[in-house]
Swiss-Prot record:
SUPFAM superfamilies: PLP-dependent transferases
Reactions listed under catalytic activity: N(6)-[(R)-lipoyl]-L-lysyl-[glycine-cleavage complex H protein] + glycine + H(+) = N(6)-[(R)-S(8)-aminomethyldihydrolipoyl]-L-lysyl-[glycine-cleavage complex H protein] + CO2
Organism for this UniProt entry: Neisseria gonorrhoeae (strain ATCC 700825 / FA 1090)
Annotated family: Belongs to the GcvP family.
The protein's name: Glycine dehydrogenase (decarboxylating)
PANTHER family in UniProt: GLYCINE DEHYDROGENASE (DECARBOXYLATING), GLYCINE DEHYDROGENASE, DECARBOXYLATING
Ranges in coiled-coil conformation: none
GO cellular component: cytosol; glycine cleavage complex
Function noted in UniProt: The glycine cleavage system catalyzes the degradation of glycine. The P protein binds the alpha-amino group of glycine through its pyridoxal phosphate cofactor; CO(2) is released and the remaining methylamine moiety is then transferred to the lipoamide cofactor of the H protein.
Length: 950
């Protein structure tokens, strides 16, 4: 035996893929080898001519060791920078049982509410925190970050406001990263931003205004008067408020504002070099149908019991397309759950103690500096002490002294330095900082301290009074509450989730481990560059890998969601065309089958959408495309196209599509939603795309988190690279330096990038291509087996599909009256999450099994759908009534089968329809949720405790 054969660097690929199933799967689809299968599936014209230029795979242990070495190059100083990011303590019970728990992080966005009641309750808890602290009656389930939330507030103010103006006022005290993102958005909306002193806000006519509360340099201003004067003119007022300060300060609603927004990172979410974090967004009730993002609402189920769901979805891009309130198609659900549970665990007394401790430490520090003769700039502050030293030399000296002692401060300007206190600040920090600021070693203070907040600024109302914030303060109680909610949700630790266009693949444990390493989690996004060498190396590694995979010349990691990636890619095209003197190019061609984010994104950039027809095979109609491209050639900006198509096939004409667009002066944006069917076998840049966004939360193993976080970096050809997002506070060392940004942090949600790095490193060049091949094979196996019972709507070359297939339920629906929704809900009784329902074609299911499912799991899923087909036949044959059968009554709960039973089918048929279901039964917590009732009677706050008890 050779020793070398006992070491297997490709061991991870064998865990990610089921190599032992290859022969059986190939035989089922009528192929002799994997090469033959891929050759008969992928058009030869787009086949990648050479293998991937990636390193060889490393084992899990070796990859973790290598990444640990990279992480160790980051320097963890004590961060007193502030600007919206602060060290915090993640309660360990929440860290282990939510953030590190696949029952929470592998779930999908809760479209199927009946099997998502746990995280829906957690998100409702988050909304209630935001409602309590802001004073508004409605809050969303989170947005991407504070800066984009501010931009959304600006857009919403324009939608709902009545002032006939295109001018928007911005308080000069807003965070610089927020202003930068607002500049990006405002330009293409045609808004003029006026940045000035907050007290001058009422001196002009504005459709909206944004104030910072607490200001970027720490001051707390009483905004009530100026807001009142603006409101008298009809201006819509938004307040960006520090979430921790609102524990003590008057709410934005009490100040008279219309909208409140901010970052909830301080509520137990690590800084993570910029993210991910959950932004909050709260507002007046009359604006609810114009708000961006997800809103969780209380409804009822078919038995009349309270049930939760995502509400008012008709606002969103997947329905309203270019008329949507935003292109947002996700939230930061996992991070919102962390922040909400932080409030649940600490309760009102706990969060008040933390907020008071932060403020008191800052006050003690300020008092000591004043006693020593230093000039504290702001008399009234919450957590940030800004000192003016009168000279650059002295300010630099203090900054350097703090740095040498292991503290990062913020240089406000040439003469001013700020220190932002936070939850993890301790006595020793006071002494160290005092020494840095004064040069003196002796630091004393009285235990009884007078704060720096005026009485008229302080909150008088109670917060967090709902029982959920007053019941789980011991670890045992909290542990059991989290477990109770987890058990109400179906995530990928229970069964496959075959959502088409979503790529719900394995999120391996080894990939997830590094995200909680302090070397990654405890870095401020604006830390000195010398302290972030590890992150910079990680980013460089990933940039090289993604360039090799896609064929592009440059990568931008700033977009912190897929929709943000779309926006950034199209933004680069717009900026490039403007630089070429072609700002008039404003026509965007979009195929009829496109995801709703595409037209919504185009509209946000001031583009006019022209829809391109598809043919009977689901492909872009080349003749229609050519005609419309030529018709609009003088104004053509771009085409937005998904590949493989949203219909799940490799379009033979993709090169022709790109050529036609280029010949008519346009650029090609490729939506990377289906990149999982490309890696190692084709390159988007090589077939003609100019820019592509990549969903790292799909193709590259970042989990969906129950509705976020995501990452949507973009790949660009060289001519577009200078027009990618830049950043006002961080040197990205890229060609796009000087451009305004699309997200608050330069590298988006950087702390989840190690997940993708681990995936790339453990798979290596062979594993990455194998993953694509297996994604195709699994999908074609499912399609072949299901085609015996259901029509497969679209196929490509040789009757093959790509990585997903569309099952057409319309003929069955017409014959039986059983709907696609009935079948989706019935799958829950079999222990499965439904595939994508009615997208991209109404009355269908789109199935994407991914490469990481075994044949055994695929067979269980197939058996479930075949069994459901037999159940539908019983309805057709009259054996079961159309209005009383397991499909229309699905899903069935434990309460159903233990109560009275008058149905024409048995209890066993209801809940144990196949033998395998008995072995691993998942019980939906509620019956079918009433969507109409929930929208007509919107309640987005926590219901009374008796509802939980019932």
């Amino acid at each position: 035996m050779k020793l070398s054969e006992l070491f297997n660097p490709n061991e991870f690929a064998a865990r990610h893929l089921s190599f032992g199933d290859e022969a059986a799967l190939l035989a089922a689809v009528g192929e002799k080898s994997m090469d033959e299968f891929v050759g008969n599936t992928l058009p030869q014209s787009i086949r990648m001519p050479s293998e991937l230029d990636l390193p060889e795979a490393l084992t899990e242990a070796d990859a973790l060791a290598k990444l640990k070495g990279i992480a160790s190059k980051n320097v963890i100083n004590k961060s007193y920078i502030g600007l919206g990011y602060y060290p915090t303590r993640v309660p360990n019970v929440i860290l282990r049982n939510v953030l590190e728990n696949p029952g929470w992080y592998t779930a999908y966005t809760p479209y199927q509410a009946e099997i998502a009641q746990g995280r829906l309750e957690a998100l409702l808890n988050f909304q209630q925190v935001c409602i309590d602290l802001t004073g508004f009656p409605v809050a969303g389930a989170s947005l991407l970050d504070e800066a984009t939330a501010a931009a959304e507030a600006m857009a919403m103010a324009h939608r709902v406001g009545k002032v006939k103006s295109e001018r928007f006022f911005v308080d000069a005290r807003v965070y610089p990263q927020t202003l930068d993102v607002m500049k990006t958005r405002a330009k293409y909306f045609g808004f003029e931003l006026v940045v000035s002193d907050f007290a001058q806000a009422d001196e002009g006519e504005y459709f909206g205004a944004l104030f910072q509360y607490v200001g970027k340099d720490g001051d707390v201003q009483d905004l009530q008067d100026v807001i009142g004067r603006l409101k008298a003119k009809g201006t819509i007022v938004a307040v960006a408020a520090d979430i921790m300060s609102l524990v003590l300060l008057k709410s934005p609603a009490e100040l008279g504002a219309d909208i409140a927004l901010g970052n909830t990172q301080r509520f137990g979410v690590p800084m993570g070099f910029g993210g991910p974090h959950a932004a909050y967004f709260a507002f007046k009730d009359e604006f609810k149908r114009s708000a961006p993002g997800r809103i969780i609402g209380v409804s009822k189920d078919a038995s009349g019991k309270p049930a939760l769901r995502m509400a008012l979805s008709t606002r969103e891009q997947h329905i309203r397309r270019e008329k949507a309130t935003s292109n947002i198609c996700t939230a930061q659900a996992l991070l919102a759950n962390l922040a909400g549970m932080y409030a649940v665990y600490h309760g009102p007394k706990g969060v008040k103690r933390i907020a008071n401790r932060i403020h008191t430490l800052a006050s003690v520090f300020a008092d000591a500096l004043v006693s020593d003769g230093l000039k504290v700039v702001h008399e009234v502050f919450f957590d940030t002490v800004t000192v003016d030293f009168g000279s650059k030399e002295k300010a630099d000296q203090v900054f350097a002294a703090a740095l040498e002692s292991g503290y990062n401060l913020r240089s406000v300007n040439n003469t001013q330095v700020a220190a932002a206190f936070h939850e993890t600040s301790v006595y020793e920090d006071l002494a160290d900082l005092y020494r840095a600021f004064t040069g003196k070693d002796t630091f004393t203070f009285a235990d009884d301290v007078k704060g720096r907040l005026n009485a008229e600024l302080l909150r008088q109302d109670d917060i967090l009074q709902h029982p959920v914030y007053n019941s789980y303060h011991t670890e045992h109680e909290m542990l059991r509450y989290l477990k109770k909610l987890e058990d109400r949700d179906l995530a990928m630790n229970r069964s496959m989730i075959s959502l088409g266009s979503c790529t719900m693949k394995l999120n391996a444990t080894a990939e997830m481990l590094p995200i909680t390493w302090t070397e990654f989690s405890d870095i401020h996004p604006y830390a000195p560059e010398a302290q972030t060498a590890g992150y910079r190396e990680l980013l460089a590694d990933m940039e090289n890998s993604l360039k090799a995979i896609t064929g592009f010349d440059a990568i931008s990691f700033q977009p912190n969601s897929g929709a943000q990636g779309e926006y950034s890619g199209m933004l680069a095209i717009r900026r490039y065309q403007e630089a070429q003197g072609e700002a008039h190019r404003n026509i965007c061609l979009i195929p009829k089958s496109a995801h709703g984010t595409n037209p919504a994104t185009a509209a946000m950039l001031g583009l006019k959408v022209v829809v391109v027809d598809t043919d009977e095979h689901g492909n872009v109609n080349i003749d229609d495309l050519k005609a419309k491209a030529e018709q609009h050639r003088d104004a053509l900006s771009a085409i937005m196209i998904t590949y493989p198509s949203t219909h799940g096939v490799y379009e033979e004409g993709i090169r022709d599509i790109c050529r036609i667009i280029h010949e008519n002066g346009g650029q090609v944006y490729m939506d990377g939603a289906n990149l999982n069917a490309q890696i190692g076998i084709m390159q988007p840049a090589e077939v003609g795309a100019d820019v592509l966004h990549m969903n790292l939360h799909k193709t590259f193993c970042i989990p969906h988190g129950g509705g976020g976080p995501g990452m949507g970096p973009i790949g660009l050809k060289a001519h577009l690279a200078p027009f990618a997002p830049g950043h006002t506070l961080t040197d990205t060392h890229s060609a796009s330096a000087g451009q305004t940004s699309v997200a608050a942090a330069a590298f988006g949600s950087a702390s989840i990038l190690p997940i993708t790095w681990m995936y790339l490193t453990m798979m290596g060049k062979q594993g990455m291509e194998q993953a694509t091949r297996w994604a195709l094979l699994n999908a074609n196996y499912v399609a072949k087996r299901l085609s015996e019972d259901y029509p497969i709507l679209y196929t490509g070359k040789n009757g093959r599909i790509a990585h997903e297939c569309i099952v057409d339920l319309r003929p069955l629906k017409a014959e039986s009256g059983i709907t696609e929704t009935d079948i989706a809900k019935r799958l829950m009784d079999y222990g499965f999450h439904a595939p994508t329902v009615s997208f991209p074609v109404a009355g269908t299911l789109m199935i994407e099994p991914t490469e990481s499912e075994s044949k055994a799991e695929l067979d269980r899923f197939i058996a479930a759908l075949k069994s459901i087909r037999r159940e539908v036949q019983k309805v057709i044959d009259g054996e079961w009534p159309k209005d009383d059968n397991p499909l229309v009554n699905a899903p069935h709960t434990a309460a159903d089968i233990t109560g009275e039973w008058a149905h024409p089918y048995s209890r066993e048929e209801a809940v144990f329809p196949l033998p395998f279901v008995r072995e691993h039964k998942f019980w939906p917590f509620v019956n079918r949720v009433d969507d109409v009732y929930g929208d007509r009677n919107l309640v987005c706050s926590c219901p009374p405790m008796e509802n939980y008890e019932d």
